[in-house]
Amino acid sequence: MSYKKTDALMRHLRDSGISIQGPKQKRQLINTGYFHGYKGYRFFGNAHRRLPFTSYDEVYATIQYDSDLKALLYGKMMFIETAVKNIALESILVNANSESIQDMYDKVVSGYNNAPASATIEQKRKLQQNKLNLQNSIQSSLAYAYKKNNPKITHFYNNIGYSDVPVWALFEIMTMGDLGYLLSCLTYDVRDDISKRLFLNVSCDTDRQLIYKYIYTLKDLRNAIAHNAVVFD
């Protein structure tokens, strides 16, 4: 299968009903890329909802709009991620009264033995499984960071003065998805504390689930912005 050079891609676009010509639009196609640009922006939401473009001007305007939208959201998204991480971290440290990851597991993460009194056996088992999954995820993240010589983690493993990685260092390598899962595994009291620190309306959040559901909702948008994926749809 042969690849197409820019001129051939322009002919292919014209054959597909997209008007494109001249050095200006050729440069725009080169800069935005055929696969990232045209192929990435010709649909809205999914491949079954094709946008009715007839000229490359329309395609390029859509790409520019999407880029401007990402630029507008980037700073705000980074602020939200950083603020929520630090507020959650402070709450965990205070409620665990320790910076130890093991103490975090024992004191502020829900499991079989600290499940609500009203929990059924099955609910207790689910909480314990979630806790085990969390521990496995955190260990995998630490192992990967160590393998990649991340100084935020290797400092603690390679220094005889430390016995383990503290919670605050763990937070430095957590993705937004990791953060959301950790928040979902915390005890009700700690989720309640974090929610109030964030001034969330807890009166409409009986189970204190909004804190991690918001993070899950924002996660995909954050990743799309960071990796220059399409966000306008």
Write out the residue ranges for each language-model feature.
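Amphipathic alpha-helical interface elements
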Residues: 1-233
